Amino acid sequence: ILETDDLVEQRKFIERLHNMARDAGRAREFDGVLRAFITDFIQEKKQQASDQKTRFFDQPMELFCGQWRAEDTGISMVYYDSKNMPQTICACPHPILPVEILKNVDTNEERICLAYLKYGEWQRITVDRDVCADAKKIVGPLSKNGVEVTSENAKYLVRYLSDCIGLNPAALKPKPSINRLGWMGQQFMPYAQDIRYEGDPNFESSFRAVCEKGDYQIWKEHCHILRENKVVRMAFAASASSVILE
């Protein structure tokens, strides 16, 4: 009875059985058995859905998503209301999932990188952790970047993202990140290994521009000549001091 997707036919069939039970003088017994059956049915469905995984086309990674159905048509969940009738809620009409958690080495604050499929290609956006935990905060940053989130489905999207993060601690283990140049322990940014930049996007190009280029030996020989001038030598010392000092 409950496996059918046609709610009208489902209701008609239950009413027919109820009338037959009433004619037999066992309506109350039928109602009790039906309630118990529906409760068991719902629990079984929840158990079956608890191990679901994301199934997006060309997804960057596969995650456990609990009771959410995460497919190319969007993210949704079926729940049963107070009358034990199935209801569907939609968290997002297109694929989206957390793919990376960045933990700032200076502040210990976390940011979450979300991947979402729009216009036939996967795109990414990184937001503060509290944005993904608040239905009011999540709408602005995500919607202006193309994610279909509104005040109506925001709370469901927050629940979905929270479930994905909570169910995948190994796949989404926080990675160290930094938003500045300079020393980080015994390593110096931007040359440190396995540390991500997660600062203001407007300064990322400047951050990436600091890199090794040219011939060190030629530079060294030329600077050796320039350092014969005391003023130039002082300028060299001043420019290097911020790097030398932690």
Give the positions of each predicted feature:
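Contiguous, well-ordered alpha-helical segments that form the cores/surfaces of helical PPI scaffolds
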Residues: 231-245
